UniProtKB/Swiss-Prot annotation:
GO terms for biological process: positive regulation of cell migration; tRNA wobble uridine modification. Keywords: Cytoplasm, Nucleus, tRNA processing. It comes from Xenopus tropicalis. The keyword Transcription regulation does not apply. CDD domains: Elp6 (cd19495). Belongs to the ELP6 family. Its main location: cytoplasm. This is Elongator complex protein 6.
């Protein structure tokens, strides 16, 4: 995890806020570093995590997590981490010859053209409370949910899935949901933009990573906007003024600073 980002969010590993839906967005940059932060943060905080990875392999996340001081393989073995490797599941679905395995595949809806109930059932079962567990709270992390749009899932079905996930994990289980949606500004993808806007109205916190309008800079890799509390306060998102920080990504951590106050500039 990135301690400076925890400080900006007022988060710590001793106590974890519950019932929160956090939306991660990016535009003209890659916001994946935010996913790695939350994955390592919740594991180090002692939460049980269900991670739905739709864009990268387990080894990719494991290598990054190792740099952040978290061993994903150990977390899986101990039952703290339930990892769905979407790339492998989708490959098995397309090229596998085992009908029984296809039925139990959480992504079987992609072939059947049905709703996302199999994936929801997987998430719900993975995070359901059970006797003897000592984890602080259940957490669902999805990276990147907009990939399902490109695989043919209608936006309304995807929004229904997210609604049920929030109702189950955040309300029923008193846990948290973190979801990444890549920006659609460059591609003009209307469905992706609809998904992002709809989820933004349902979230308590939005972290939005943006590329610099001035272009590439060696010492400043982008800026992060933090929107808070629009759902709980009843305000519209546009009425909520974001906190804005610039950042530089390094090998094992990310440095944040106020706009124009990079050490290279000063």
């Amino acid at each position: 995890m990135f301690p400076e980002l925890n400080s900006l969010l007022g988060a710590g590993t001793d106590t974890v806020e519950r019932g929160k839906f956090t939306l991660l967005c990016d535009s003209k940059t890659d916001g994946s570093f935010l996913v790695h932060h939350f994955l390592s943060y919740y594991l180090r905080a002692g939460c049980r995590v269900c991670f739905v990875a739709l864009v990268q392999s387990f080894s990719h996340y494991s290598i990054v997590a190792q740099k952040l001081g978290v061993n994903l393989s150990s977390a899986k073995d101990e039952g703290q981490l339930v990892f769905l490797e979407g790339l492998r599941s989708y490959t098995d679905l397309l090229f596998g010859d085992n009908p029984e395995a296809e039925v139990t595949n959480p992504l079987c809806f992609l072939r059947a053209g049905s709703d996302l109930k199999p994936l929801y059932s997987f998430v719900s079962a993975a995070l359901a409370p059970s006797a003897g567990q000592s984890w602080k709270c259940p957490v669902l992390i999805l990276d990147d949910v907009s990939v399902l749009l490109s695989l043919g899932v209608p936006p309304l079905q995807l929004l229904d899935f997210m609604h049920y996930c929030r109702a189950t994990v955040c309300t029923q289980y008193q846990g948290n949901v973190v979801c990444l949606v890549h920006g659609a500004e460059e591609s003009g993808d209307e469905e992706k933009e609809l998904l992002r806007r709809s989820l933004s109205h349902q979230s308590q916190v939005i972290l939005w990573a943006e590329g610099l309008s001035s272009g590439f800079c060696k010492e400043v890799h982008g800026q992060l906007k933090i929107f808070r509390g629009a759902v709980s306060s009843g305000k519209k998102r546009g009425q909520t003024q974001p906190e804005i920080y610039q950042y530089k990504i390094q090998d094992k951590h990310v440095t944040f600073f106020a706009r124009g106050l990079s050490a290279a500039v000063l």
